[in-house]
C-alpha cells in the first residue's frame, strides 16, 4: 500500500512539474512572438520612412534635372 502511495505521489509530482514546464514554454513562445511582432512593426516603420525619403529625393532630383534642362 505504501509503495502504491509513493508511486502515486511520484506520478502526481511529475505531472505537476510537466504542467509547469509546459506553461513556462507557452509563455516564452508568446513573448518571442510578441518580440517578433514588435520587430516587424519597427521594420515596416523604417521601410515607410526610407520610401518617403526616396520619394522626396526623387522629386528633388527631377526638379533639379528640369531646372537644368530649362536653363539650356
From Swiss-Prot:
<dbReference type="GO" id="GO:0045087">
    <property type="term" value="P:innate immune response"/>
</dbReference>
<dbReference type="InterPro" id="IPR022731">
    <property type="entry name" value="Dermaseptin_dom"/>
</dbReference>
<feature type="compositionally biased region" description="Acidic residues">
    <location>
        <begin position="29"/>
        <end position="39"/>
    </location>
</feature>
<keyword id="KW-0878">Amphibian defense peptide</keyword>
<dbReference type="GO" id="GO:0050832">
    <property type="term" value="P:defense response to fungus"/>
</dbReference>
<keyword id="KW-0295">Fungicide</keyword>
<keyword id="KW-0472">Membrane</keyword>
<dbReference type="GO" id="GO:0031640">
    <property type="term" value="P:killing of cells of another organism"/>
</dbReference>
<keyword id="KW-0044">Antibiotic</keyword>
<feature type="propeptide">
    <location>
        <begin position="22"/>
        <end position="44"/>
    </location>
</feature>
<comment type="similarity">
    <text>Belongs to the frog skin active peptide (FSAP) family. Dermaseptin subfamily.</text>
</comment>
<dbReference type="GO" id="GO:0042742">
    <property type="term" value="P:defense response to bacterium"/>
</dbReference>
<dbReference type="Pfam" id="PF03032">
    <property type="entry name" value="FSAP_sig_propep"/>
</dbReference>
<keyword id="KW-0399">Innate immunity</keyword>
<comment type="function">
    <text>Antibacterial peptide with activity against Gram-positive and Gram-negative bacteria. May also be active against fungi.</text>
</comment>
<keyword id="KW-0732">Signal</keyword>
<keyword id="KW-0165">Cleavage on pair of basic residues</keyword>
<keyword id="KW-0929">Antimicrobial</keyword>
<dbReference type="GO" id="GO:0044218">
    <property type="term" value="C:other organism cell membrane"/>
</dbReference>
<dbReference type="GO" id="GO:0005576">
    <property type="term" value="C:extracellular region"/>
</dbReference>
<keyword id="KW-1052">Target cell membrane</keyword>
<dbReference type="Pfam" id="PF12121">
    <property type="entry name" value="DD_K"/>
</dbReference>
<feature type="signal peptide">
    <location>
        <begin position="1"/>
        <end position="21"/>
    </location>
</feature>
<keyword id="KW-0391">Immunity</keyword>
<protein>
    <recommendedName>
        <fullName>Dermaseptin-S12</fullName>
    </recommendedName>
</protein>
<dbReference type="InterPro" id="IPR004275">
    <property type="entry name" value="Frog_antimicrobial_propeptide"/>
</dbReference>
<keyword id="KW-1053">Target membrane</keyword>
<keyword id="KW-0964">Secreted</keyword>
<feature type="region of interest" description="Disordered">
    <location>
        <begin position="23"/>
        <end position="44"/>
    </location>
</feature>
<dbReference type="InterPro" id="IPR016322">
    <property type="entry name" value="FSAP"/>
</dbReference>
<dbReference type="GO" id="GO:0016020">
    <property type="term" value="C:membrane"/>
</dbReference>
Amino acid at each position: 500500500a505504501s509503495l502504491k502511495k509513493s508511486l502515486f505521489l511520484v506520478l502526481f509530482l511529475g505531472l505537476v512539474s510537466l504542467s509547469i514546464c509546459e506553461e513556462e514554454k507557452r509563455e516564452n513562445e508568446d513573448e518571442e512572438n510578441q518580440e517578433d511582432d514588435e520587430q516587424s512593426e519597427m521594420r515596416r516603420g523604417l521601410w515607410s520612412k526610407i520610401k518617403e525619403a526616396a520619394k522626396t529625393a526623387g522629386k528633388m532630383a527631377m526638379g533639379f534635372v528640369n531646372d537644368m534642362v530649362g536653363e539650356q
